[in-house]
Amino acid sequence: MTHSYGYRRQTRKKFAKAYKTKGHVRISRYLTTYKVGEYVDIMVDGSQHKGMPYKLYHGRTGKVFNVNPRSIGVIVHRIVNGRYIEKRLHVKIEHVRPSNVKTALSKRYQANDQAKAEGNKAGKRVSTKRNPGQPLEAVQVQGAVNFQHPKVFREIF
């Protein structure tokens, strides 16, 4: 028997809820306020079938462009034929959570500003570029302290 090509195909693990989190949605999901221009993460809740986005958008970060009483309009960028297309989705609140993108970005900006201020006081120029992890420095390996050479045994015929 051939497999189906349904709307929720191959989502058994993707939409599964974590251990001890099954059941109803917590009230904090509904009480969170969203404003136009905020960044949100689309995380599909498999127990809520209404307003569920397509599986491709699970885990994507988007920008809120519309707020309704029970749903949120989110702009997500999707690659189609080698170019980015702006997709506008309306997703129910159960499938959305606030994103930490802005908080991480603002922390980095504050650290950069502080480093620049310290550099100006010292009269040095500070680079705020993010560098990839550099290779480890060379280390000389030393032998064990109590190393004993192998003993010579006589041959057995």
Swiss-Prot record:
GO terms for molecular function: structural constituent of ribosome. InterPro entries: Ribosomal_eL21, Ribosomal_eL21_CS, Ribosomal_eL21_sf, Translation_prot_SH3-like_sf. GO terms for cellular component: ribonucleoprotein complex; ribosome. The keyword Ribonucleoprotein applies. Gene3D superfamilies: 6.10.250.3260, Ribosomal protein L21. Keywords: Ribonucleoprotein, Ribosomal protein. The keyword Ribonucleoprotein applies. Belongs to the eukaryotic ribosomal protein eL21 family. This is Large ribosomal subunit protein eL21. It comes from Tetrahymena thermophila (strain SB210). The gene is RPL21.
